[in-house]
Amino acid sequence: DGVIAYSFEDSVYVQFTNGETVRIARGGNALSTLSFMTDGRLMALSGNKFIAIDLSNGTREELLSWEFSDEPKAVEPPKDYIAEQQQSLVEYIKLQRKNRQEKDDAQKALAKENSSVAPTPFYFDKSHRLAGISVSPAGNFAVVATTESKPTRDDSDIMPHYIQEDSRIAAKPVRQRVADAESVNHELWLLNLKTGEKSELKYFNLPGYNDDVLADVKAENAKAKGETYEVNRLPRDITLLQSWYWTKPSIRWHKNGNAVAVMLEAWDNKDRWIATVDLANKTLENQHRLHDDAWVNYRFNAFDWLNDSETLYYQSEHTGYSHLYVQKPGEKPVALTSGRFIVDDLTLSSDDNYIYFKANMEHPGLYEVYRADLS
């Protein structure tokens, strides 16, 4: 509606349609990942929580928070036979446990029904860390990716730096060698912010999720040794796609908050999937698979929703060239471009009539701006 929110240094500003600019935050817990919700409030990430800010009066509401720890329990089960007997035979112990459990149940019920109480945090494996999170503009769901928390480098990832003020040689930490990188997997979760339910989104619906993509090479190597290779059908490690063109997670909500798509990649870089989330059944639904026996490009991966229709638009190189497609979930994609050229830098018009893009139609080294007519 023309309202703009932005951050500068330690402050967050909102510019209204009348031209007035108001600072709504300065210092304290930094606000980032700014976006507008369907009800006009400003949503922001603050530490390990998302909040919603009412721009008319400045009030804030916590939408969700998360912790990587064991969920606190009002009562713990007995650890052995002696503890079991103690808890079942001693009336005082039984009463104390009963009271703690009832108090905990009442507090959780109050948090669900009373907006005066902050929602209960979502708890994840304490050995994991956050890999990505995105909240629906409607404030009713969130998609979260977590991964095992482990160091990405060690003391050997160093490089000599010769130019120093003291004329000595300094050892600088650098990225690890490619050969030292270990496989990474993301667990994907759907959070229902209204009910507090947490559901894992399994990858079983992704075609090829357990393909042994190097089976031919491994079989050839085994044959040379006089051995036989048995095809491996274990699930591959899969993550949110890490693009060279954006830093936010590869999770895209439609602006109405009722549809969400994710872009996933296999750790071996042979497959990329665009999938939507069935919010009712809590499952992933594959919409497009891009496979490359060599390597899926880190470019040409733009994807998003049209503004006024739950229709995806995206880039794909499955023909060998990066081209532009639109697709209603569950239907076949429609190619908007084709030929021996590449399409990049997509921009959707606000009225959904055009997608502007850059392409080298006339010559591989000559890029010009074009538009695809969606009307």
Residue ranges and their predicted role:
Residues 1-375:
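Beta-propeller folds
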